[in-house]
């Protein structure tokens, strides 16, 4: 832990790190309504208060969770989901580090509070970074990590007494330490001639703003007390027969029956089974294909599971439906294969980032982004640099957008961040991530980290253990991390299945000299492949551009420079994709916010779209390229032409 001048950890810490996380058990199925399940979203306005006290502990010392938050002092209306940073006009809140408090009163349906055969669950989809939760003043759960969901069974708290409401209080701390994901450090400024006593700043080693708050939906949902806890599905193909292997876990009863039906998109039952595990065979199966690779992409079956259980209160039934895409993924020395066919990633890196809402989930923004992805002809993106919202993954399944699913392992550059404590937490994060996203056909590869100091001696053991653990959790998908180290010094790449390389030739060095890009990029690819004989993805490349800046001949930050740099990369990518390069992902889809610095003009401007999703010149260049690539690499001839005539906009 980072320690202050008195030898104790930064005053933000004592309540933050009081307990370690045990290895995860149980499922994390997405809450859905069914014949046996209900859900109540708690999105909207919450009461909010930041703890501006010197030690950031006033809320705990005064036990703000024991009574309505408004009684503790002034509160703000805070929208959920949203980051809190850009909502208010108080500049202190934008860069606030420490504990903030959220509260919401929820009115519950009478059946939820009186039917003892009903289980009531509170689910928080994302709270950045560390969260403690109380219901009616009673502690119910804690969670470390800002990008994955967590839950608490609150049935006993809401099913006692005449109350038909519950008061939910959530305290969130956004402090990052060398052992968090992502990591960071607290730096105390001790020169009292320049800084007030106790002044500190949060330092990070990643290039995006450390937005915080309740970023994704908060909701209540119900199940019977005997319920379907988890479902795991893997798929395979035997000639034209699709194979769906399933495993179902039940909680709340040892005496139960399970019925499983697989339905096609027309609602017809194509296979059925019984029991907690088995294999369904689907003759003449429709496979799940990526967008633009097939005339019928993203085909989804529905796996309907019915549980009938005997309990002390009598028989109970539970129903859950899981979308299933039948597809295979494989990697050779030179190819990435989906359903046995070579797949070429032509896509983007993204961020969950937008004006005002920060990293807050927004359906309007999400649908707009997917419309832009399809307009662009992109077939893939990486969830740089953390797991995205579950709803994002669901749309990827529906639209056929392939996903490299990345953990929050960004900024792992200090030796302390390779410690056993860091590794243990990273292993747990991968468990949470795989548990949540394992059933999404769009997810074709796990990425455990981005640009770590993989040249450090500790990195070899760290990535051997981390990648091995991820493969043990999910043997069906390849695993990678994204490197910016040199091929001869990287100690983690020997353990990956696909080499993902970030490089910024003629941007972060050789400024303005685009004439060296082709030589340097070709050399990069040749040395990596000669050393490891693995397929390679150019996982990041790009240039910063401020829309409306024009210079000819091209100068840095102009739209012409961004276009010219991309064109130089594309020359070599076109050569090497015929050999062993299997993808290219531009950095970035859209401009995004960063910490303030002389190097950043209100954020990172490497997007091909502005933060408001307006296209720069490079967007049209990339669109022309991606549609050309789609036509060259499609599996069936009618795949692209049926949706894009003359490379014109289309409606799906």
Curated annotation (Swiss-Prot):
Keywords carried by this UniProt record: Glycoprotein, Glycosidase, Hydrolase, Lysosome, Signal
Enzyme Commission (EC) number: 3.2.1.31
Gene Ontology molecular function terms on file: beta-glucuronidase activity; carbohydrate binding; protein domain specific binding; signaling receptor binding
Compartment list: Lysosome
UniProt keyword Signal present: yes
Residues with glycosylation annotation: 173, 420, 631
Active-site residues (renumbered): 451
Domain of life according to the entry: Eukaryota
Catalysis performed (reactions): a beta-D-glucuronoside + H2O = D-glucuronate + an alcohol
Activity control: Inhibited by L-aspartic acid.
Hydrolase recorded as keyword: yes
GO cellular component, one term: lysosomal lumen
Signal sequence annotation: 1-22
Known role: Plays an important role in the degradation of dermatan and keratan sulfates.
Subunit structure: Homotetramer.
Family statement: Belongs to the glycosyl hydrolase 2 family.
Record-linked PANTHER family: BETA-GLUCURONIDASE
Name of the protein described by the UniProt record: Beta-glucuronidase
Organism: Sus scrofa (Pig)
């Amino acid at each position: 832990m980072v320690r202050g001048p008195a030898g104790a950890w930064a005053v933000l810490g004592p309540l933050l790190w009081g307990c370690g996380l045990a290895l995860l058990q149980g499922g994390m199925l997405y809450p859905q309504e069914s014949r046996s399940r209900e859900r109540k979203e708690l999105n909207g306005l919450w009461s909010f208060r930041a703890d501006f006290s010197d030690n950031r502990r006033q809320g705990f010392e005064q036990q703000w969770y024991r009574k309505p938050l408004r009684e503790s002092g002034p509160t703000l209306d805070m929208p959920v989901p949203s980051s809190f940073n850009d909502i208010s006009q108080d500049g202190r809140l934008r860069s606030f580090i420490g504990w903030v408090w959220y509260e919401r009163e929820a009115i519950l349906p009478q059946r939820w509070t009186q039917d003892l055969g009903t289980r009531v669950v509170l689910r928080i989809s994302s709270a950045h970074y560390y969260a403690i939760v109380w219901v009616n003043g009673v502690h119910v759960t804690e969670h470390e990590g800002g990008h994955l969901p967590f839950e608490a069974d609150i049935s006993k708290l809401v099913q006692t007494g005449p109350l038909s409401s519950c008061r939910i209080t959530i305290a969130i701390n956004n402090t990052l330490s060398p052992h968090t994901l992502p990591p960071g450090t607290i730096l105390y400024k001790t020169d009292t001639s320049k800084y007030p006593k106790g002044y500190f700043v949060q330092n990070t080693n990643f290039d995006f703003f450390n937005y915080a708050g309740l970023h994704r939906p908060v909701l209540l949902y119900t199940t019977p007390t005997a319920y379907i806890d988890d479902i795991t599905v893997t798929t395979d193909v035997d000639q034209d027969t699709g194979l769906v292997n399933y495993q179902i876990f039940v909680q709340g009863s040892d005496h139960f029956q399970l019925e499983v039906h697989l339905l096609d998109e027309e609602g017809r039952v194509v296979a059925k089974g019984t029991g907690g595990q088995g294999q369904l065979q689907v003759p003449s199966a429709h496979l799940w294909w990526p967008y633009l690779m097939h005339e019928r992409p993203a085909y989804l079956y529905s796996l309907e599971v019915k549980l009938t259980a005997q309990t002390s209160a009598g028989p109970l039934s539970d129903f859950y439906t899981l979308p299933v895409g039948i597809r295979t993924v494989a990697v050779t020395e030179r190819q990435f294969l989906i359903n046995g066919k070579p797949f070429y990633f032509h896509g983007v890196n993204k961020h969950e980032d937008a004006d005002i809402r920060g990293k807050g989930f927004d359906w309007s923004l999400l649908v707009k982004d997917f419309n832009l992805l399809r307009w662009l002809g992109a077939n893939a993106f990486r969830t740089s640099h953390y797991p995205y919202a579950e709803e994002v993954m669901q749309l990827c399944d529906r639209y056929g957008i392939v996903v490299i699913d990345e953990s929050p392992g960004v900024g792992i550059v200090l030796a302390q961040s390779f410690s056993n404590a860091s590794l243990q937490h990273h292993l747990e994060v991968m468990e949470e991530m795989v548990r949540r996203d394992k059933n999404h056909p769009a997810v074709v590869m796990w990425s455990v980290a981005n640009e770590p100091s993989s040249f450090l001696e500790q990195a070899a053991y760290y990535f051997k253990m981390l990648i091995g653990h991820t493969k043990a959790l999910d043997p069906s998908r390849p695993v990678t991390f994204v490197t910016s180290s040199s091929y001869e010094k990287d100690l983690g790449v020997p353990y990956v299945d696909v080499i993902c390389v970030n490089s910024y030739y003629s941007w972060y060095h050789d400024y303005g000299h685009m004439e060296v890009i082709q030589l340097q990029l070709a050399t990069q690819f040749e040395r990596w492949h000669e050393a490891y004989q693995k397929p390679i993805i150019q996982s990041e490349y790009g240039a910063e551009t401020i829309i409306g800046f024009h210079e000819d001949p091209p100068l840095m930050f102009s739209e012409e420079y961004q276009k010219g740099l991309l064109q130089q990369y594309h020359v070599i990518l076109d050569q090497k994709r015929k050999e062993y390069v299997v993808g290219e992902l531009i950095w970035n889809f859209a401009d995004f916010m960063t910490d303030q610095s002389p190097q950043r003009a209100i954020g990172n401007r490497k997007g091909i779209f502005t933060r408001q999703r307006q296209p720069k010149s490079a967007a049209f260049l990339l669109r022309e390229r991606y549609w050309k690539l789609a036509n060259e690499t499609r599996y069936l001839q009618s795949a692209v032409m049926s949706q894009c005539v003359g490379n014109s906009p289309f409606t799906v």
